[in-house]
Amino acid sequence: MTKVGGGDAKNTLYCSFCGKSQHEVRKLIAGPTVFICDECVELCMDIIREENKSSLVKSRDGIPTPKEICKVLDDYVIGQPQAKRVLSVAVHNHYKRLNHATKHNDVELAKSNILLIGPTGSGKTLLAQTLARILDVPFTMADATTLTEAGYVGEDVENIILKLLQASDYNVERAQRGIVYIDEIDKISRKSDNPSITRDVSGEGVQQALLKIMEGTVASVPPQGGRKHPQQEFLQVDTTNILFICGGAFAGLEKIISTRGKGTSIGFGATVQAPDDRRTGEIFRKVEPEDLLKFGLIPEFVGRLPVIATLEDLDEEALKKILTEPKNALVKQYQRLFEMENTELSFQDEALNVVAKKAIERRTGARGLRSIMEGILLDTMFDLPGLDSVEQVVIGPDVVEGKSRPLYIYAERNEKSGTSA
């Protein structure tokens, strides 16, 4: 470290970054071939501090804390507070476990894969995608309905690991810490409570095939995908530290939960059961492993999903918030599209209420909101690029119900016109 002091001009040292001489600064730090002054060091520290403010607060292990994970989930996913808490804790503990494994050998911490149960359109897939974004780890999604046992037409379960490798640019080390989300997991349930005497290659067979990679095994993955050949070279991927999140709507599971413990009887002496008026998401909260077994999942598969998070039905208020509040909310997306035509798109508050009601009637949850919005704005998006000076498009409740056309406000005349969309 060179301190400020007098000296000849020939021997004067300069900061390699800002060009100031050693006489103009308090301290000049010398490297092998460069010098940096205390002012440039302070500037670098300011930049790093600013970046740290915008990033997640980390725990001592360098992993986002459960509260911070939950907070970021709130930015993208509306509602589902209990599911967010369960996921935040499970994911935090999983990556804490990975750090622990490199430091201690006395206690081995087991992996806790996650099962998400909730009605369609309640946010299962979005939660998994957002988690991967928060943690900056490789993430891939697989559809359980396309999977079959090895040797049959369809995708092998090893293809899931191949997709994870592709998401990590074939960095095996990074892929081995990734997250896999398997959607439609309820579709691979076996068709009856009793083990089948015939081969069920896309149901129970897939559950059996998934057991080893979910628990932890070294999978041989063909780099180019497809079926395995004897002459082909394989990549060896250890799945022990890959977090598996399985999600499904589990249609019909609510009936199994509701009737649990009540028994069944027929004939004149049978007890008439009162209908269960609770919402599906509310019933799901009472789910037990035995209910999943009755639904058609095999015991070994249920045992490998120790963490169960249930999602609620989205009500009208939640659907309305989904339209406007998240960072990538639907209304914001369409407003950005209209901005590209130099037009402002605005929705009246009552119009958003009607959109939410329509989604509830369709029973498609948040997933149905986009199709409703497309139907409302289709004609406007078709005509708008060919119209001049449309400053604003206003959508009211009558427009959503199909009783009237959007209101156009023109910049030239500065007057309102109910011109056809």
Swiss-Prot record:
Binding site for ATP: 119-126
Binding positions for Zn(2+) per the UniProt entry: 15, 18, 37, 40
InterPro entries per record: AAA+_ATPase, ATP-dep_Clp_protease_ClpX, ATPase_AAA_core, Clp_ATPase_C, Clp_protease_ATP-bd_su_ClpX, ClpX_bact, P-loop_NTPase, Znf_CppX_C4
Protein's name in the database: ATP-dependent Clp protease ATP-binding subunit ClpX
Keyword Oxidoreductase appears in the UniProt entry: no
Domain of life: Bacteria
GO biological process: cell division; proteolysis involved in protein catabolic process
Signal sequence interval, chain numbering: none
GO cellular component: HslUV protease complex
Species assigned in the record: Methylocella silvestris (strain DSM 15510 / CIP 108128 / LMG 27833 / NCIMB 13906 / BL2)
Residues covered by the ClpX-type ZB domain: 3-56
GO MF, any single term: ATP-dependent protein folding chaperone
SMART domains: AAA, ClpB_D2-small, zf-C4_ClpX
Known role: ATP-dependent specificity component of the Clp protease. It directs the protease to specific substrates. Can perform chaperone functions in the absence of ClpP.
Gene that encodes the chain: clpX
Gene3D superfamilies, sorted: 1.10.8.60, ClpX chaperone, C4-type zinc finger domain (6.20.220.10), P-loop containing nucleotide triphosphate hydrolases (3.40.50.300)
Family statement drawn from the similarity comment of this UniProt entry: Belongs to the ClpX chaperone family.
SUPFAM superfamilies: Glucocorticoid receptor-like (DNA-binding domain), P-loop containing nucleoside triphosphate hydrolases
